[in-house]
Structure formats: C-alpha cells, structure tokens
Design a protein with these regions (language model features):
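Conserved beta-strand hairpin/beta-sheet module of binuclear metal-dependent hydrolase folds
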Residues: 2-66, 202-214
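Flexible, acidic/histidine-containing loops and adjacent segments that form or flank the divalent-metal
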Residues: 2-5, 81-214
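Short acidic, S/G/P-rich loop/turn micro-motifs used as interaction or catalytic elements
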Residues: 40-43, 78, 171
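Short, well-ordered alpha-helical microsegments
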Residues: 17, 80-81
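Soluble catalytic regions of membrane-associated enzymes that act on cell-envelope
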Residues: 64, 74, 95
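Metallo-beta-lactamase
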Residues: 68-79
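Active-site-proximal beta-strand/loop segments in catalytic clefts of secreted hydrolases
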Residues: 23, 36-39, 74-76, 148-151, ...
C-alpha cells in the first residue's frame, strides 16, 4: 500500500500512458488505481528497445499495479487509446470515463473493410475500431461507462478530486454528430475525406482534467 499519491508516466513511445495510485482503504490492496490513456498497440512503436519503451499492458504485467479501478480515454487516437484494449484484457477496470455518450459505441458498425489511403488514416480507423471493441468488452464485463462534461467535480478517493475542464457539451455534441456522419457514409471517397478531417480535429475534443490532491 502506498503512503502517498504516486504518479507514473509509462514510456510507451510517442503516445501517452499514465498510472495514478492513491492510498485509500476502501479499494483493493488499500490503493485506488487510475489509468489515463494506454499508448499505442503498434508493434513497430516498440522495436527500439534501447529507449526503454514498452507496451502499456507489458508494463502492467511486469510492474503492476494488479488492478485498475478507473480507466480514462482522453480521446480516440491510436497512440492514446489502442494500448488500453490489451490493458483492459489484463485488468478489467471498474469504471471507464470518456467523452462520447456511454452508449454511443453500441451503434457503431465494425468498420472492417473500410478504405484508407495513408498510414495516418489507417491508424485513426484502427483507433475507432478499438474504441468500439473496448467499450463492448468493458460493458460485457460489468464496467461502468461514464461520459464526462466540463464543469463536473468528482471525488476519486481520499484527498483526490478531479475537475473536468473540457470538453464542453457543445464540443461533445459536435464530435458525436461528425462521427455519426462518418460512420453512416457509404461512398468510399467521402468516407476517407471525413475520416481525415475528423482525425485532424480529434485533439480538440480531448478530455482535460485537473487533479487536486491534499
């Protein structure tokens, strides 16, 4: 059991993956464990072992922690989201926070076989597929899916408070509208155009959190 809050930034290469552990006797092992993003799932991202980078799930398997109370996806990009899928298969989180409506994934098609022309388009399409797969898997295992909105203040554990700074409801509605337009598009050229445009804007819809620990 940790005696104070511990924040770990895992070397997953270009993307992001963070683990926050906070002492609280109400949780397993006396620690509340929160994961924010999971880095990439591309094997090529980890070929350079000299840098010390490794897949997020491998880090969890080797160094722990042995459970996840809360998993957060800041936005749907390959180098932030796709590493969460194997991490969740290793340790299913009790709760999952993200920006889309908690049931949006259920209406998403598989997206298998949709066309791409560039590596960037392929990465974004895989991120969308993995988001869908992740949410389906989490829901099937009883994880509580929650949508965050700017202005919320949430107590996470003893002494730790989370303030949601972004996105605003207007931004989330815009994201869902544009994503629905993309998913419903049948013409290949128009699909690729919408895919590229949404990929370029996705960072604008990211979760922004301020954590306060006392």
């Amino acid at each position: 059991m940790n005696q104070t809050m511990k924040l770990t930034f895992v070397n997953v290469g270009y993307g992001e993956a963070m683990i926050l552990e906070c002492p609280d006797p109400r949780y397993r092992g006396g620690n509340f464990v929160m994961v924010i993003d999971g880095g990439s799932a591309e094997p090529g991202e980890f070929e350079d072992s000299v840098s010390g980078r490794l897949p997020f799930s491998e880090y969890l398997r080797t160094y722990g922690p042995d459970h996840i109370d809360l998993m957060i996806c800041t936005h749907i990009h390959e180098d932030h989201l796709c590493g969460l899928l194997p991490a969740a298969e290793l340790n299913t989180p009790s709760a999952f926070w993200q920006t889309l409506s908690s049931d949006f994934y259920a209406s998403m098609p598989p997206l298998d076989g949709r066309p791409v022309k560039t590596a960037s388009q392929d990465k974004f399409l895989r991120a969308l597929r993995d988001y869908r797969s992740l949410c389906h898997s989490l829901a099937a295992h009883g994880t509580v899916l929650r949508t965050l909105r700017a202005g919320e203040i949430i107590s996470l554990c003893e002494g730790l408070t989370c303030r949601v700074l972004a996105p605003a409801a207007l931004r989330t509605d815009e994201l869902q509208r544009d994503l629905r337009s993309l998913l419903d598009e049948q013409a290949d050229d128009a699909f690729i155009e919408k895919l590229t445009a949404l990929d370029a804007r996705m960072n604008n819809y990211s979760l922004m959190l301020m954590l306060e620990y006392q």
